[in-house]
Every structure is written in structure tokens, then in C-alpha cells.
Amino acid sequence: MDLHTAVYNAARDGKLQLLQKLLSGRSREELEELTGEVASGGTPLLIAARYGHLDVVEYLVDRCGASVEAGGSVHFDGEIIEGAPPLWAASAAGHLDVVRSLLRRGASVNRTTRTNSTPLRAACFDGHLEVVRYLVGEHQADLEVANRHGHTCLMISCYKGHREIARYLLEQGAQVNRRSAKGNTALHDCAESGSLEILQLLLGCNARMERDGYGMTPLLAASVTGHTNIVEYLIQEQPAGDEQAQPGLARVQPQGARSSPEEPPSGESYESCCPTSREAAVEALELLGATYVDKKRDLLGALKHWRRAMELRHQGGEYLPKPEPPQLVLAYDYSREVNTTEELEALITDPDEMRMQALLIRERILGPSHPDTSYYIRYRGAVYADSGNFERCIRLWKYALDMQQNNLEPLSPMTASSFLSFAELFSYVLQDRSAKGSLGTPIGFADLMGVLCKGVREVERALQLPKEPGDSAQFTKALAIILHLLYLLEKVECTPDQEHLKHQTVYRLLKCAPRGKNGFTPLHMAVDAETTNVGRYPVGRFPSLQVVKVLLDCGADPDSRDFDNNTPLHIAAQNNCPGIMNALIEAGAHMDATNAFKKTAYELLDEKLLAKSTIQPFNYVTLQCLAARALDKNKIPYKGFIPEELEAFIELH
């Protein structure tokens, strides 16, 4: 163990005497080095503050000159928080004595992490009321500094259910109607977490019932998350804009005027909504029933809520009609929503139809752009797959994928997850078919080809974005999944017309000239073993000669270069794949092309393996190649003296 790590570990474990022994007598430069960041990104002061070692903290600051503002990486609840100052770590862990000490020594009370989280927000997150009181009351911590998502201290207190912290923040003038980047308010956070008492507290402070960026009211948010207590409370008949406090609820009086009912919403305007209208109550109960079906798996509970919704629809002789769908959906087995009490009661004998009703209701109320809509369609498909009904699963997943591609941004994590699920499912079904023969589940060319086309479309959409996605891990993963789908497609028999369609689709992909990590083309990725790892379950195995041949047949450039000037031949050599190397060479790959380190592919082959003996480089090296390498090796000037095509040829070597 080196000295730097020993200092860090001593600070982490609170071993002051050992720390003093390690650091005493050191020069200022040595102390600065030893109290700086370790390999994991943390510092001794940061880790000591995180674990509440007051004596170590004060020693490092007072005697060793450690900076109270230096940020670093620290672990909390299984996550790595980057750029966290020591005060943030102490506040998050609830170490009030360390918080006091750091502030006395000049720490900034509003210093943020990389995600713009303040020490106050950290204390609010885990419910450290005394730390919150000290930061706000003694050091005037800013209540309104939001994190990168626009989420404030009041919002996180409400979401985590810390009632006394929420009450204190409101007393100090926290803005009760502040909006996050996605338009949600503290009321939404209460509804999503089921904190009825805090929700009542917010309403007592004139919190407004408004829609977020997805069009969700707090009432609908409670329905989606299945918090019946919130739904029941909000659908009670209470006049909109009622200024009277709720029975038994002490109204909090904010010290400032920022949460007054006249406070205008900041930024984008959102529609205010009345939570107690008949239509809102009906939709909330219907959506709550859908949540009972898919999330709580309680069909009888769902029927109870749907009955109440149906009664409200017919209340007073004025029927509230449901909008007619433009067309019935194959994925939903052409189901349509029930409209009468008799149709509703008949559902009790048909659980599968109840599950389709839940999907229909969710899509109608939340709309196709809400993440829950496609999520539960995929969830229902997965349940069918688990029971062996792969055909029904594929239909639902295709419908969800279309919904995601039409409504979400390119390379959305949800869309990527759908593509990966398809690849894993197709791999499983093909293996099942291989093992069971005709008894296995059949999977057709159309199923695989349809998803491959959608995958190529996703890459095309991503490349149309203003920002270049080439360095994005998500983009690399999308390319890898497409290659896995192509790998699986090679295992399915197809007609000449289908083969032509497959080649057209691959040509579309190559025409986009997509680049993954390190500038890898699809051909580079097809010869790289790392492409195998795309998810939890195995799909295809790479390097893959079959995929390489398809890519080459469709026009992939065998001499394309990555950021290190490696050709696919170099990557194939690093993976010791002589069969693939021969295929690349036959397609015109230059055997003696060098990379940025002046290595040819042949030189990268492992000497210990037979691969090197199966490749004969001199069979593919021309006199022109040798002359080009001689020019480069001897640094003979050639630019401007020979044709441009020859200059490019020499640079290849």
C-alpha cells in the first residue's frame, strides 16, 4: 500500500494518531500531495467528513492545510456522488458537529456537487432536520438552489416523506409552487410518494394543483403510483380555490411572501387544474384501477375502482362519454374499452381482457409520450413471454417500440432497452427452436427484419441531431444491438427477395457512416469481442464471420480507420481471428496498413497462437506497398512531388 492510500484509509477509519504519524514533519508540498485526491476520486478530508470523524477533519484543515472546498467523489446509498465538497458529505450523513466545524473554517454553505446539489439538499434528502435548521437558521443557506433537474430542497423533502423538514422549509419561505425542469411541483412529489400529511401541509400553504410537462396532475400522479389515500383525499368535493384550511390542519405561515396565492408561475406556463371535477375524478379512478391491475396485481381491487368511475360517469343522468379510439389495435387483441356497467361486470370472468383494459385506459389518459404507457405494454408482453406466448409478446413489444420512436428523443434509454429486450427474446426463441426442433416456437424473418429496420431508423434519427452522438455510450450500444440482430437474422432462412431486403437495410446503416466508441465503424465492431457484451443475457457471439461477410457484401470499407488509425484488420488481429482476417483481405483490406503506433495487423497477432502461422503477409504485399513503407521509414519528403492518390496510399502505410 502506498503512502497516499494509507493516509486516505486512516482518515476514513478515523485513526487520528496514525494519520499524525504519517503526516507529521512533511513539507507543505508533500502535505498538499498526500491530502489530495486518491485514485477513486476522493480526498482524506472528504471521506473523514462523510464518516463524521471531527478530530480528523479539524487536523487535516488546521494542521495540514486541506482545502474545505475541494470536491471529490464519495459513495452514498450505492451511488457515487461526484464533485462533492466535504460540507455536502457531512450534511448528507447528518454529522452536525462536522458541519459546524467546516462552516467555522470557511466552507461555503451553498457549494454544490457536479449535479448542482447543495449541502442543504443533501440534508433534506436523508431527513437530517437539525442539520437543515443549522444550515438555514445560522448560515442562511439558499432554499431555492435546485439540482440539475430543477428539483428543490422542498421537493425532495416531500418526496422522501420528511414532514418536519418540509414544514420548516415552508416556514422559512420556500416557494411552494416552484417547478422542476419537467414541470412537476412539490405536490407531485407528495402524490408520488404517498405523503398525505405533507400534501395537506402544502395545500394549507396555497399550493396549486397544476399539470407537469407530461400533462400529469398530482391526482393522476397518485393514481399512477397507486397511492389510494392521496386519490381518495383529492377527489373529495372541495371547491376549487378554497381559502379555508382543511379540518384539523394547522396552516403554516411562511416568513416570506414568495408562496402567496398571487405568485406567478416561473418559466413555461402550465395549465392549472381542478382536482375535484367529475371528469378528473373519473380519470383518476380509472387510472388507479389500471395501476391495481399491472403494478399491484389486484384485479378485484381494480374492479372496485372501475365501478366507482363508471358510477361517476353516469352520475346525475349526464353521461361522460369516453373518446372513441381512431382504430382498434392488434397488439391489444382488438379490445375496446368497456362503456356500461354490464360490460364492466363481465370482465371478472376474463382476466386477460381486464389486463387489456388497463393498457387501453393508461394510453388514453396518459398518452403515448408518457413513459409509463410504453413501460406497462412491455411489462405485459414480458409476462406473456414468460408463459410461452411469444407471438403475443412480440406484438405488444412492437407496438411499444413504435410508440417510443414516435414520441421519445432518439437513443432514449427506454427505446434502447426495448431493442435489447427484442434481441434477447429472439436469441432465446432461436435457441429454443434449435433444441426442440419443430416443437420449438417458430420465429419468422419478418419479426427479426422489422426490428432491425427500426434499429437502423433509430441510428438515422440520432445522426440527424445537432450534437454528434459518436462518443455516446448509448449510441455505441445501439450499434452493437443492431449487429446482434443481424447476427440472429443470419440464422433464419430467407428467400432471395428477403435477402435483398436485408442487404438494403444494412446498406442504409452503412450509408449513415455511424461511428461508435473510439471511432469504430460497424465493421470494426463486428470483429471486436467486446461487442458480445450488450446486456445481462447472451445474444450473439463476436467476432462474427457471418456478420462481417454481410457488412462487406453491402459495401463496408475494409480499410476504414478508427481514432487510433486501426483498420478492422487490426482489430481482428487483436482478437486473433485469422478466418475473419482472410475474409477482410479477400475483400481488399490492406495487409500492411499501419495504425497510429506504426503496427501492421500481422504484428498484432499473438505469437503463441496458431493464428500467426495461418496468415502469410507476403502473399498480399506488393512492391508498391514496400516502396511506400520505405518512404515513410526513411522520412523521404514526397508531398507535392507525387499525385494526391499516391500520397493517400503512402499515408496508409
Curated annotation (Swiss-Prot):
TPR repeats by residue range: 282-316, 374-407
Asked whether the keyword Magnesium is assigned, the reply is: no
**Where does the secretion signal sit in this chain?**
none
Pathway(s) of this molecule: Protein modification; protein ubiquitination
GO terms for cellular component: Cul2-RING ubiquitin ligase complex; mitochondrion; ubiquitin ligase complex
* Ranges where the record places region Disordered: 242-274
Pfam families, sorted? Ank_2 (PF12796)
Share the record's PTM remark: Phosphorylated; highly phosphorylated in myoblasts and myotubes. Phosphorylation at Ser-108 promotes PGE2-EP4-mediated inhibition of inflammation. Dephosphorylated by protein phosphatase 2A (PP2A).
Origin, by domain of life? Answer: Eukaryota
Point out residues bearing the modification Phosphoserine.
108
Name the SUPFAM superfamilies on file.
Ankyrin repeat (SSF48403), TPR-like (SSF48452)
Q: Give the main localization category.
A: mitochondrion
Its subcellular locations are: Mitochondrion; Cytoplasm
GO terms of biological process kind: negative regulation of inflammatory response; positive regulation of inflammatory response; proteasome-mediated ubiquitin-dependent protein catabolic process; protein ubiquitination; regulation of ubiquitin-protein transferase activity; ubiquitin-dependent protein catabolic process via the C-end degron rule pathway
The ANK repeat units are at: 2-31, 40-70, 82-111, 115-145, 149-178, 182-211, 214-243, 518-560, 564-593
Q: Which InterPro entries match?
A: Ankyrin_rpt (IPR002110), Ankyrin_rpt-contain_sf (IPR036770), TPR-like_helical_dom_sf (IPR011990)
Molecular function terms from GO:
EP4 subtype prostaglandin E2 receptor binding; ubiquitin-like ligase-substrate adaptor activity
Name the family the entry cites. Belongs to the fem-1 family.
Question: So what does this one do?
Answer: Substrate-recognition component of a Cul2-RING (CRL2) E3 ubiquitin-protein ligase complex of the DesCEND (destruction via C-end degrons) pathway, which recognizes a C-degron located at the extreme C terminus of target proteins, leading to their ubiquitination and degradation. The C-degron recognized by the DesCEND pathway is usually a motif of less than ten residues and can be present in full-length proteins, truncated proteins or proteolytically cleaved forms.
What is said about its interaction partners and assembly? Component of a CRL2 E3 ubiquitin-protein ligase complex, also named ECS (Elongin BC-CUL2/5-SOCS-box protein) complex, composed of CUL2, Elongin BC (ELOB and ELOC), RBX1 and substrate-specific adapter FEM1A. Interacts with PTGER4. Interacts with NFKB1; the interaction is direct.
The molecule here is called Protein fem-1 homolog A
Source organism (scientific name): Bos taurus
The major lineage groups are: Eukaryota, Metazoa, Chordata, Craniata, Vertebrata
